[in-house]
């Protein structure tokens, strides 16, 4: 079996180490309404279309209870749309600062292209948001062959439609000749639902939720424990393989090709 294409996520996978751009914005829009949410709660739905992310936060039992305590009722669709519009406005203003490619990504992409591998991408950001991210990422040397956003298909993650559209545009089939790489639970589900080899990247991921400085300064035993927690979470949600850094991806690819593995 030959791998012909790799589909990458963006924030937390190829750019924005730790996926911090949306995090504080989610926390801020709830705080403004007197409802405090934790960073862990804000990260849990990461990878979804952002309005779906806001909706998922309002459906978490603790947050829903706190909202009801403050407002006397559960959040409505009008509340969700109002918060999303506010989220988007703030995010647009900060996105240019969160499009830096993660160390090693550009080199891995170049190596894959030397092998004739096509590079696709999916995201939880809207097309309008991605226009900002792509523009900045290109200036810094990262540009996949194709991008699909949730705006381009009937539904975003965990549905497989963004991966299918990548496959059509890149001209690659069957789906098990492609690898999906991401940093969230919804990425793992997207890849598996699409019938692709699915790989979770840990360092720099939203699931790990650490800055580069925190990773470098953390006690090695504590860091290893956190890495293993994320690794297990990825596997439990469908990852065929996990890698700590993007530099390990080609080893995974060679393993799949040499062993003639079959997706199960």
From Swiss-Prot:
<dbReference type="InterPro" id="IPR006323">
    <property type="entry name" value="Phosphonoacetald_hydro"/>
</dbReference>
<feature type="binding site">
    <location>
        <position position="183"/>
    </location>
    <ligand>
        <name>Mg(2+)</name>
    </ligand>
</feature>
<feature type="active site" description="Nucleophile">
    <location>
        <position position="9"/>
    </location>
</feature>
<dbReference type="InterPro" id="IPR041492">
    <property type="entry name" value="HAD_2"/>
</dbReference>
<dbReference type="GO" id="GO:0019700">
    <property type="term" value="P:organic phosphonate catabolic process"/>
</dbReference>
<keyword id="KW-0460">Magnesium</keyword>
<keyword id="KW-0704">Schiff base</keyword>
<comment type="subunit">
    <text>Homodimer.</text>
</comment>
<dbReference type="Pfam" id="PF13419">
    <property type="entry name" value="HAD_2"/>
</dbReference>
<dbReference type="GO" id="GO:0050194">
    <property type="term" value="F:phosphonoacetaldehyde hydrolase activity"/>
</dbReference>
<feature type="active site" description="Schiff-base intermediate with substrate">
    <location>
        <position position="50"/>
    </location>
</feature>
<feature type="binding site">
    <location>
        <position position="9"/>
    </location>
    <ligand>
        <name>Mg(2+)</name>
    </ligand>
</feature>
<protein>
    <recommendedName>
        <fullName>Phosphonoacetaldehyde hydrolase</fullName>
        <ecNumber>3.11.1.1</ecNumber>
    </recommendedName>
</protein>
<dbReference type="InterPro" id="IPR006439">
    <property type="entry name" value="HAD-SF_hydro_IA"/>
</dbReference>
<dbReference type="InterPro" id="IPR023214">
    <property type="entry name" value="HAD_sf"/>
</dbReference>
<feature type="binding site">
    <location>
        <position position="11"/>
    </location>
    <ligand>
        <name>Mg(2+)</name>
    </ligand>
</feature>
<dbReference type="GO" id="GO:0006281">
    <property type="term" value="P:DNA repair"/>
</dbReference>
<dbReference type="GO" id="GO:0000287">
    <property type="term" value="F:magnesium ion binding"/>
</dbReference>
<comment type="function">
    <text>Involved in phosphonate degradation.</text>
</comment>
<dbReference type="InterPro" id="IPR023198">
    <property type="entry name" value="PGP-like_dom2"/>
</dbReference>
<comment type="similarity">
    <text>Belongs to the HAD-like hydrolase superfamily. PhnX family.</text>
</comment>
<dbReference type="InterPro" id="IPR050155">
    <property type="entry name" value="HAD-like_hydrolase_sf"/>
</dbReference>
<keyword id="KW-0479">Metal-binding</keyword>
<dbReference type="GO" id="GO:0005829">
    <property type="term" value="C:cytosol"/>
</dbReference>
<dbReference type="GO" id="GO:0008967">
    <property type="term" value="F:phosphoglycolate phosphatase activity"/>
</dbReference>
<dbReference type="InterPro" id="IPR036412">
    <property type="entry name" value="HAD-like_sf"/>
</dbReference>
<keyword id="KW-0378">Hydrolase</keyword>
